[in-house]
Amino acid sequence: MEYNFREIEKKWQKIWVDNHTYQVNEDASKQKFYVLNMFPYPSGAGLHVGHPLGYIASDIYARYKRLQGFNVLNPMGYDAYGLPAEQYAIQTGQHPAITTVNNINRYREQLDKIGFSFDWNREIRTCDPEYYHWTQWAFIKMFNSYYCNDEKQARPIEELIEAFSTNGTQGMNVACGEEMDFTADEWNAKSEKEQQEILMNYRIAYLGNTMVNWCPALGTVLANDEVVDGVSERGGYPVIQKVMRQWCLRVSAYAQRLLDGLETVEWTDSLKETQRNWIGRSEGAEMNFKVKDSDIEFTIFTTRADTVFGVTFMVLAPESELVAKLTTPEQKAEVDAYLDRTKKRTERERIADRSVSGVFSGSYAINPLTNEPIPVWISDYVLAGYGTGAIMAVPAHDSRDYAFAKHFNLEIRPLIEGCDVSEESFDAKEGIMMNSPRPGAPEGGLVLNGLTVKEAIAKTKEYIKATGLGRVKVNFRLRDAIFSRQRYWGEPFPVYYKDGMPYMIDESCLPLELPEVAKFLPTETGEPPLGHATKWAWDTVNKCVTDNENIDNITIFPLELNTMPGFAGSSAYYLRYMDPRNHEALVSPAVDQYWKNVDLYVGGTEHATGHLIYSRFWNKFLHDWGISVAEEPFQKLVNQGMIQGRSNFVYRIKDTNTFVSLNLKDQYEVTPIHVDVNIVSNDILDLEAFKAWRPEYETAEFILEDGKYICGWAVEKMSKSMFNVVNPDMIVEKYGADTLRMYEMFLGPVEQSKPWDTNGIDGVHRFIKKFWSLFYDRNGEYLVKDEPATKEELKALHKLIKKVTGDIEQFSYNTSVSAFMICVNELSSLKCNKKEVLEQLIVVLAPFAPHVCEELWDTLGSTTSVCDAQWPAFNEQYLVEDTVNYTISFNGKARFNMEFPANAASDAIQATVLADERSLKWTEGKTPKKVIVVPKKIVNIVI
């Protein structure tokens, strides 16, 4: 019987669906294992061969763990909200819900063809109201919570309200936007609106004025990673910096826990370090500086309190509220022009760009230790979101301050003995202090001269704390997350507005569903697209959505017009997979206790500072409320590399429609042109297909070599514009899903990026055919016999089992594929057809090539799926070599080799070697001085 992969794969994909083969339920008798891929955004282009790489890798592992007896959860769903669907809707008028469903259906069709062991019973879509019910529910929880620094967890906001009404802010140690000070009487005297405004300073989900990346053309706020070189990643539209009132999540409250949690997870060191740097913990001090001839005072944060004597200027972030207060009338025009320029640069660009720019505010601050006046400048190298948005500049000991001082000819005052700051700053935290204070300064106060830097830092902190000039503080670079977007296609906020303040709708009324709108663009008055909705008001009496015309601001109020960002739906989806049809809770306690968290998470490193931070924060918040038993959502993380496109080029002779083959192109002046890789095979162009590809090539002529047109090639990002996108459907149709699965793994280590190159796919396909031929001959006769295996056959098998078991644990799938090829070659040479061997071979190969293995497993007479078999253990006794090859050397030079039984004694080996006629030749009749036998390696005869 011939290997007919089309029939086999279609047959088993249907059987898996009909028999619910991959459906899983909680089973207390089995140890659980939760495998998860970062779920895809269903774009209109569908999958290309790069997308399934991580899915295949995790699917192999999921199948392997099931064969080991684990109860494996391996779900899949869709991150279905997003900007592309909305942009398409704007262009075509087609509702995003329709295009999203169409795209999902296309993805599902493609995924099914590849043969994944997903439990589709648990499928989720973030745009499904049944799903975003729980996203809205979590948001309400966050709104109604504050973070207690003493207990290191979220607590109900009612506890804070009660504390304020009893003690005011006295004794409070809670996460907040700004520190407030009021008594219980002052709190109780405030109106409801005033109290709500104060509580916004403490809520975990809150409204705040933040600097955002605003894209006027798209009409929305963009995340930093959605902006490239000052324009939107999607569409290339200009982006400016703008202060807007936005919903935010107080992620910063969890900064230390996010750091600590990294010690408990199995992630790569590089990814952990990326998150540590993003969170950016720094220990330092806050110091207060007064403004000269003013009542204004502002605070700076510094990790080098010891350098306060070296401050020669102050710098404010352009977004700082202090800019307007400190800019003098004489400087206003210059400052306004500078602010206008900086608003076009994103924060990320400002961090990366080392060019110097700035403007003098016209004001001076007073150094609290020396009473010297210090000029206050404005520059975009200072960020509003880090520290206080103001810095004391010490150019002698900070490289960016140094560059600024050099550019604007400001004083540079060194504080470390012997340091040379003529060419660059001295940033090292080492040396002996000087100029602290400078010679001739008034006596009294803080003196650091003669101390080491470490001693000086400690002494300065103690001094400012004792004198009230500041305080010791730990600071984090991590910002609160902006959580609102001015778009249509996203989760609606369960929020209505009363007297300008936000209130939550009752949890019992969830989900609040996305309304229909006439247009997906902002309104003419600049409101988000939900401003077009005519039925978008909340009736607090009847607890339902009602027409806008009914708004009376007594019992019926306007609903929030913003929607949630893309990361809202992906922040807790792993929990919903555990219990996707539960209408009463995100996940039931019993189910949560069973699955706990994700044992293996597979996805790209590009999510290191986005999704992977937000999910960890979200999970820790839910953990505080007793909803997620595990504090960390993803125990082990594997980052798959990218499959790059292998582009092909044709070479057109300038000013002609003639194309010259690769190795002849240097004889002409040519222009390289990308050509569709689907009309190229092994770098040889299909000439007729090329002519039919585009009208302008219909009359093309060719200069060939040996009758063929050979294309050039390059490894580039896989994209439609380079015509190097390879559709997996084409590979599945031509070679089968099992070949695709094994070939993607064969390309190289999972974690590394590698080029897609079909030049080697035939070899993998031939391997599967050769594997098939162990069971059937060319005439279709079944070969398998129930006879004892030979020692050589068992050795080949157990060598494979040991190798593949270790490889799977290490995700070294490429070497596993090589091992399969070697083993099948060995068994073919041995003409092995023993059921004892082939049965175990099927099980070991099944995670990689499930369709063909199911078919052959069935032919062995099994009544269950190969998925329910048992992973074989390798037996070391079969791996012991019967004979050992010894190198025979004379005076250290290798001359020939001899085989000996593995258990041969040294005396016997020595006698046999000396009696060999080749030894007699090399000894020339002389008696050896010494014979050294190194067991299982070498015999060295010293003459």
From Swiss-Prot:
Positions of short motif 'HIGH' region: 40-51
Work out whether the entry's keyword set contains Nucleotide-binding. yes
Q: Which residues bind ATP?
A: K720
Q: Look up keyword Plastid and say if it applies.
A: no
A Gene Ontology biological process noted in the UniProt record is:
leucyl-tRNA aminoacylation
Motif 'KMSKS' region — list its residue ranges: 717-721
Q: Which UniProt keywords apply?
A: Aminoacyl-tRNA synthetase, ATP-binding, Cytoplasm, Ligase, Nucleotide-binding, Protein biosynthesis
Principal localisation: cytoplasm
Short name of one Pfam family for this protein?
Anticodon_1
Task: Provide GO CC annotations from the record.
Answer: cytosol
The chemistry this enzyme catalyses reads:
tRNA(Leu) + L-leucine + ATP = L-leucyl-tRNA(Leu) + AMP + diphosphate
The listed locations are:
Cytoplasm
InterPro entries, per this entry?
aa-tRNA-synth_I_CS, Leu-tRNA-ligase, Leu_tRNA-synth_edit, M/V/L/I-tRNA-synth_anticd-bd, Methionyl/Leucyl_tRNA_Synth, Rossmann-like_a/b/a_fold, tRNAsynth_Ia_anticodon-bd, Val/Leu/Ile-tRNA-synth_edit
Q: Which CDD domains match?
A: Anticodon_Ia_Leu_BEm
Q: What is its EC number?
A: 6.1.1.4
GO MF terms, alphabetically ordered? aminoacyl-tRNA deacylase activity; ATP binding; leucine-tRNA ligase activity
> Which domain of life does this protein belong to?
Bacteria
Listed PROSITE patterns:
AA_TRNA_LIGASE_I
> Family, per the entry?
Belongs to the class-I aminoacyl-tRNA synthetase family.
> Any idea what this protein is called?
Leucine--tRNA ligase
